[in-house]
Amino acid sequence: MYSEIQRERADIEGLMARPEYREWNSELIKPKKLLNPVKASRSHQELHRELLMNHKRGLGMDSKPELQRVLEHRRRNQLIKKKEEELEAKRMQCPFKQELLRRQQRLNQLENPPQRDEDHAPEFIKVRENLRRITTLTSEERAL
């Protein structure tokens, strides 16, 4: 049986054309087998190595496939970008609204500092103001 296989191979080799470029000229560039760009890439090799190691360790059985993880990561990044764009759109409002906001903030600042001054005032001033209110209330009550 082994001899039959050898005979078939010999017949096949006889049918196949032999490359004649070897006999013509030794200066010609001889063709080489092309490399698969996917398998030749470093990232693909690292991914394959990582998958083999995880398979040997038994990891990844319950975890998500890499494609699903990448898709989720992209979706998450898209949501973050979308939120940032919405915030940027809110910031970049028309000039009229920006001016209204500035005026509103100025009015709030003008109203709030007197309250802040009262909070930071020494206690004897607060007591004195309380006494004035009491005395004015009692004088008004007397008038009634």
Swiss-Prot record:
Induction: Up-regulated in the hypothalamic paraventricular nucleus (PVN) and the CA3 region of the hippocampus of the brain in response to postnatal maternal separation or food deprivation and glucocorticoids stimulation in adult animals. Up-regulated in CA1, CA3 and dente gyrus regions of the hippocampus in response to acute social defeat stress or glucocorticoids stimulation. Expressed in septum, the neocortex, the CA3 region of the hippocampus and the cerebellum (at protein level). It is found in: Nucleus; Cytoplasm, Cytoskeleton, Stress fiber; Cell junction, Focal adhesion; Cell projection, Ruffle membrane. Residues 70-90 form a coiled coil. GO terms for cellular component: actin cytoskeleton; cytoplasm; focal adhesion; glutamatergic synapse; neuron projection; nucleus; postsynaptic actin cytoskeleton; presynaptic actin cytoskeleton. Stress-inducible actin-binding protein that plays a role in synaptic and cognitive functions by modulating actin filamentous (F-actin) dynamics. Mediates polymerization of globular actin to F-actin. Also binds to, stabilizes and bundles F-actin. Involved in synaptic function by regulating neurite outgrowth in an actin-dependent manner and for the acquisition of hippocampus-dependent cognitive function, such as learning and long-term memory. This is Actin-associated protein FAM107A. It comes from Mus musculus. The gene is Fam107a.
